[in-house]
């Protein structure tokens, strides 16, 4: 039997946002299972909205690994302010909630069905129930009916007040379907993506079974409410815990089964979407456009997924529940995948070899070329690793070639049909530091001054004449002057001393001559010798006779002879 197509009322429910978005923030989750007519506004003209329509004996099953259904509506009620009620229900295997038949106020959550392996069961039905708005400070209890299979169900207790909301989750038993009607096998696919609104509900697919549990999602909102944690069951064990964080008193549910206990979380740590404005008294959550994929385009083992197609809304004032999805990859993995890779840098050896040798197009041999016949493969054949040959060629161009300071470029022309190469040009580029240039220019400072250079300075060092001639030239001049003065003084002293000594000698001789001329002298023998000429003659004769053949004269003989002669003379 072919399933019935979805009615247009459900399309309006999922595609069009409800009106009356600028009221005081009261949320109404309402569905009517018994009447086939669409719900209308309540008396008073305030725009009270019901967010679900009913289908007699047919239901819509949104399948997936885990689908969180949330029914959120907004409308003003007299005497109520900032009261929020959200119905969040996880998916379970073979679980159906029977509708409320007496059209009374019912707050049973809507539960989608899926098997324990995550494959959706399209033969299970979901019967929505009618829910009216709740007044402030009114506790409402939502309970899933008991089942026969023993799987845990869900019991959700909402305590709604002006600024607080607490949600506890307890494990209920699984419920068997009592009357299962044929479900809709076709999944609603919107024809055009609608724009995100404040009251839209975003349903996200869960992670796969390989993802680790205890993951929580937090959506930021404005001031006035608290955390609504909800536990989700995947088979028999929960896979993750979704939480909606409101601004007033932030709380988040932990992922420890079976009952997640709300723990306080600072509002600053909640993951917020940029561009969302918050207004006190209302809730503002990022909402996205729902995009439902048809399961016919996928394999039966892969459940349909709901993917967001629109950007988050900004400036929304009405409440909107958003259950964000976390992709299979973490943010660090995505950043690593999208990070640009740096280009591979060639090694210094290969880059240097390619830079030093440049081979031009082959040419013919001429007499003016400098040829090098290579026994091994030529330099132009790709063998640029012969650094010794390159160094020898560069040192031939510059004797003081230093590979660490100089860069050598050789242009070669390979010869056809031979391993010979012709050297066309060798260029050596020297990279000098400023201090090396200063040391070289110091010796040529005079030439620099002639060409118009007036000053040269490197740090504290200036031109060479300021550092060297400042003390050397005056010192040299002083030394020369002192030496000349000392030589002059020595010459004057020598001349004066010589003249004084000559004067003394001349004066003494003059005095002696004057005494001899006057007949007065101190030598008595001189007078005897001068007066006795005979004795002098005798001495001469005696000396000549005795000393004729020899210059040696005995003193004793001379003394005796002299004494005898004197005695004879006196007699």
Swiss-Prot record:
Identify its protein family: Belongs to the podocalyxin family.
Tissues expressing this chain? Expressed in glomerular and tubular epithelial cells and peritubular capillaries of the kidney (at protein level). Expressed in heart, lung, renal cortex and medulla, kidney and muscle.
Segment Disordered: which positions?
Answer: 94-361
Membrane topology qualifier: Single-pass type I membrane protein
Q: Polar residues bias: where?
A: 106-116, 126-144, 151-169, 176-203, 218-245
Q: Which residues carry this modification: Phosphothreonine?
A: 531, 569
The record's gene field reads: PODXL
Question: Which taxonomic lineage does the organism of this UniProt entry have?
Answer: Eukaryota, Metazoa, Chordata, Craniata, Vertebrata
Q: Where are the transmembrane segments?
A: 475-495
User: Cytoplasmic side: which ranges?
Assistant: 496-571
* Residue positions where Phosphoserine is found in the record: 550
Q: What is this protein called?
A: Podocalyxin
Its domain of life?
Answer: Eukaryota
Q: What species is given as this protein's source? A: Canis lupus familiaris
Q: Name one GO biological process term.
A: negative regulation of cell-cell adhesion
What does the UniProt record say this protein does?
Involved in the regulation of both adhesion and cell morphology and cancer progression. Functions as an anti-adhesive molecule that maintains an open filtration pathway between neighboring foot processes in the podocyte by charge repulsion. Acts as a pro-adhesive molecule, enhancing the adherence of cells to immobilized ligands, increasing the rate of migration and cell-cell contacts in an integrin-dependent manner. Induces the formation of apical actin-dependent microvilli.
Q: What is the effect of changing residue 123 to Q?
A: Does not reduce N-glycosylation
List cystine links: none
User: Which InterPro entries does the record cross-reference, listed alphabetically?
Assistant: CD34/Podocalyxin, PODXL
PANTHER family for the chain:
PODOCALYXIN
What keywords sit in the KW lines?
A: Cell adhesion, Cell membrane, Cell projection, Glycoprotein, Membrane, Phosphoprotein, Signal, Transmembrane, Transmembrane helix
Positions glycosylated per UniProt: 123, 199, 373, 383
Signal sequence extent? 1-22
């Amino acid at each position: 039997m072919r399933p019935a197509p979805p009615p247009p009322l459900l399309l309006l429910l999922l595609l069009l946002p409800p009106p009356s978005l600028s009221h005081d923030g009261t949320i109404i989750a309402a569905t009517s299972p018994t009447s086939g007519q669409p719900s209308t506004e309540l008396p008073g003209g305030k725009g009270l909205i019901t967010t679900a329509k009913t289908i007699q004996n047919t239901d819509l099953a949104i399948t997936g690994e885990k689908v969180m259904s949330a029914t959120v509506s907004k409308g003003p009620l007299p005497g109520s302010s900032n009261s929020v009620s959200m119905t969040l229900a996880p998916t379970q295997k073979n679980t159906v909630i029977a509708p409320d038949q007496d059209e009374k106020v019912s707050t049973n959550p809507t539960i989608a069905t899926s098997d324990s392996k995550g494959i959706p069961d399209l033969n299970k039905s979901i019967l929505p129930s009618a829910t009216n708005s709740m007044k402030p400070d009114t506790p409402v209890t939502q309970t899933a009916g008991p089942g026969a299979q023993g799987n845990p169900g869900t019991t959700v207790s909402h305590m709604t007040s002006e600024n607080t909301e607490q949600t506890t989750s307890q494990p209920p038993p699984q419920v068997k379907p009592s009357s299962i009607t044929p479900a809709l096998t076709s999944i609603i696919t919107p024809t055009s993506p609608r724009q995100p609104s404040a009251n839209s509900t975003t349903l996200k697919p869960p992670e796969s079974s390989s993802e680790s549990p205890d993951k929580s999602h937090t959506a930021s909102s404005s001031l006035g409410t608290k955390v609504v944690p909800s536990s989700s069951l995947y088979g028999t064990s929960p896979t993750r815990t979704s939480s909606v964080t409101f601004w007033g008193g932030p709380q988040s549910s932990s992922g420890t089964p079976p009952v997640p206990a709300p723990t306080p979380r600072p509002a600053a740590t909640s993951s917020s979407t940029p561009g969302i404005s918050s207004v006190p008294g209302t809730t503002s959550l990022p909402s996205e456009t729902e995009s439902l994929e048809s399961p016919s385009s996928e394999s039966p083992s892969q459940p349909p997924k709901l993917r967001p197609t629109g950007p988050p809304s900004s400036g929304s004032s009405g409440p909107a529940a958003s259950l964000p999805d976390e992709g299979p990859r973490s943010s660090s993995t995505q950043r690593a995948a999208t990070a640009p890779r740096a280009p591979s840098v060639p090694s210094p050896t290969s880059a240097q070899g390619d830079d030093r040798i440049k081979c031009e197009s082959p040419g013919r041999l001429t007499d003016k070329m400098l040829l090098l016949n290579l026994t091994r493969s030529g330099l132009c054949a790709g063998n640029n690793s012969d650094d010794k040959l390159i160094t020898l060629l560069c040192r031939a161009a510059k004797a003081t070639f230093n590979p660490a300071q100089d860069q050598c470029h050789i242009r070669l022309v390979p010869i056809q049909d031979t391993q010979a190469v012709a050297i066309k040009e060798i260029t050596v580029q020297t990279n000098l530091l400023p201090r090396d240039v200063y040391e070289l220019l110091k010796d040529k400072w005079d030439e620099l001054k002639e060409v118009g250079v007036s000053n040269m300075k490197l740090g504290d060092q200036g031109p060479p004449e300021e550092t060297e001639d400042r003390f050397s030239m005056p010192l040299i001049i002083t030394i020369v002057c002192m030496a000349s003065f000392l030589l002059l003084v020595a010459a004057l002293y020598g001349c004066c001393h010589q003249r004084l000594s000559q004067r003394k000698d001349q004066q003494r001789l003059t005095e002696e001559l004057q005494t001899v001329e006057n007949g007065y002298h101190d030598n008595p023998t001189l007078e005897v010798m001068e007066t006795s000429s005979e004795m002098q003659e005798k001495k001469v004769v005696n000396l000549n006779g005795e000393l004729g053949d020899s210059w040696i004269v005995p003193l004793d003989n001379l003394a005796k002879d002299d004494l005898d002669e004197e005695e004879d003379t006196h007699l």
